[in-house]
Curated annotation (Swiss-Prot):
Pfam family, one: ABC_tran
Protein name from the UniProt record: Antigen peptide transporter 1
Membrane topology, from the record: Multi-pass membrane protein
CC per GO annotation: membrane; MHC class I peptide loading complex
Ranges that cross the membrane: 16-36, 54-76, 93-113, 134-154, 187-207, 228-248, 299-319, 329-349, 419-439, 444-464
Binding locations of Mg(2+): 545
Ranges in the topological domain labelled Cytoplasmic: 1-15, 77-92, 155-186, 249-298, 350-418, 465-748
Family: Belongs to the ABC transporter superfamily. ABCB family. MHC peptide exporter (TC 3.A.1.209) subfamily.
Taxonomic lineage of the native organism: Eukaryota, Metazoa, Chordata, Craniata, Vertebrata
Effect of residue 273 to M: In allele Gogo-TAP1b
Region (Part of the peptide-binding site): 375-420, 453-487
Biological-process GO terms, alphabetical: adaptive immune response; antigen processing and presentation of endogenous peptide antigen via MHC class I; protein transport; transmembrane transport
Complex and partners: Heterodimer of TAP1 and TAP2 (TAP1-TAP2). A component of the peptide loading complex (PLC), interacts via TAPBP with MHCI heterodimer; this interaction mediates peptide-MHCI assembly. Interacts with PSMB5 and PSMB8.
Amino acid sequence: MASSRCPAPRGCRCLPGASLAWLGTVLLFLADWVLLRTALPRIFSLLVPTALPLLRVWAVGLSRWAVLWLGACGVLRATVGSKSENAGAQGWLAALEPLAAALGLALPGLALFRELISWGAPGSADSTRLLHWGSHPSAFVVSYAAALPAAALWHKLGSLWVPGGQGGSGNPVRRLLGCLGSETRRLSLFLVLVVLSSLGEMAIPFFTGRLTDWILQDGSADTFTRNLTLMSILTIASAVLEFVGDGIYNNTMGHVHSHLQGEVFGAVLRQETEFFQQNQTGNITSRVTEDTSTLSDSLSENLSLFLWYLVRGLCLLGIMLWGSVSLTMVTLVTLPLLFLLPKKVGKWYQLLEVQVRESLAKSSQVAIEALSAMPTVRSFANEEGEAQKFREKLQEIKTLNQKEAVAYAVNSWTTSISGMLLKVGILYIGGQLVTSGAVSSGNLVTFVLYQMQFTQAVEVLLSIYPRVQKAVGSSEKIFEYLDRTPRCPPSGLLTPLHLEGLVQFQDVSFAYPNRPDVLVLQGLTFTLHPGEVTALVGPNGSGKSTVAALLQNLYQPTGGQLLLDGKPLPQYEHRYLHRQVAAVGQEPQVFGRSLQENIAYGLTQKPTMEEITAAAVKCGAHSFISGLPQGYDTEVGEAGSQLSGGQRQAVALARALIRKPCVLILDDATSALDANSQLQVEQLLYESPERYSRSVLLITQHLSLVEQADHILFLEGGAIREGGTHQQLMEKKGCYWAMVQAPADAPE
């Protein structure tokens, strides 16, 4: 099939994606410089009345945002293809859209902020003058210098909101917020406390500046006392609010952890049987416990810190803008230098550290090889050669250590010098503002303290970001389980008041999901009649236990159908079906609970002690239970570790009989019972009046039980080879006769 894409004209050279991206971005910025910077203020000066300067500024800013956003979308579309691929844009290209927003909203936001802080003094904000300044080349440069780090941070945080790629988990952060559920009110209260506490923390820098002015102006003692008292009150209030907020947050996260872990465990329990065979129990347990705990710990610690410092940073930024726009711009412009340069040098230092460790390992390997092979070294008279080789490795380590020392010094120097340059720049520009009377000395001191706190907040946010990403990664694994749809059919609705227990296998075939090409059962057709015991015998691996698993609806046939009283098994309601069909295996699972709880396991209505005792008596379990010090309240240990194999089988038989099922499956369920208990089970199957109210599928090695069965089926290779009563099959002298005649210890 021919490609639908038209070939490029001969002689036309298509630009590669990277070149096209750079060209489109440069043209977009040129358009912003040549057209938008000068044209938009003139246009809206004509359209918007002079009496509404703030509206004019916002109209210009929003228009600039819209034009730049359309241009950014055009560059993305031309570079990465269709709109559906824009989400996969890599690197700086993906930051074009947030950059357009930052450039468009910076000036209107500043104008609105100045209007708000000058409320009650009309005209003092002077939005018109701000608009004219915004079209000046210096303002253009400052706007880009401030918008670039903001757009980079926006894009970086936006990567947390990228939809998960698997499991249909959707947006992971939104899913995490959705897990908060009913805790929204508490979290809202927590955020309010964070804001109030952050504002209270800013009392110390604010009043420090006030006290500085008081000292320089030789103010009264009352002013000093009043400022110091207010600072103390606000600081104490901030600490109290932080304590209360942390308590509310940790309590909320505890509730979220319990709720989320319960939801994940419930989702796992709803999965089909094949899921538990294809996934190791340890991996599933790790998802349910460790991943949810990791997520909860990260939410409790990292998200809390992230919110604290994010709110604190925003409050500090607002107060810094209120104090001095020019000093704030200097801070924002120099922040990338403050963090990026030490980060790059730090990577070089870390790389050298790795190389030093590798060289140490190689030198150790040389020494170990020489010392462990001394007879060989001596027989070849190569002692000096090995020593020289070791000295060469030491010389490599020495060279790397020297480089590492230089890198460490440069790393420390860049960290300190970048912070020092920022402080010097702030003090230099601030000193000029103080000299000109634009700000007071106290305001400059306040700003410097705020700037130090703001820098610390940004540094903490950048350090916490990878840990928040890790939490998002953990949440995606958890949501894979929450969103996974079980591959078993949904629970049916049939719950008839009475079941006969007629079971029909109609041409049933089956292959396990992990081996779909290997049929375990092939065209199986037989019937279990109410009031009869049908014994299923055959060699190991013939499919007997698979028949029992299908009858429990643990798997679905790959061919044919399985009917209970004429209705397909999946049409019955899940709980109802497993009350009517009970099974006991050779190694039944007993839970680490009391014997009473194990016998009543899974019943929606708690049985009486008389019913529990009666079920235990029927299978011979009551005799050993009554001899225990705590009787039916005895804890059996993890997985029934305090019980013998026969006792576990007896408890499992009682657990099945208390349900009064219409279909009873015994899959080698008496192999570990003692003689008395086996006799009781034999009487239960063939002499009890209750036998006529249920169908029994018996899989066993005990021929004494098989001989009395109403019908015997010999299964081999997944197919029924012969069937009949014991007498009929012995007369045929076929497969069953050969099995009976074989020595007791011979393999089947």
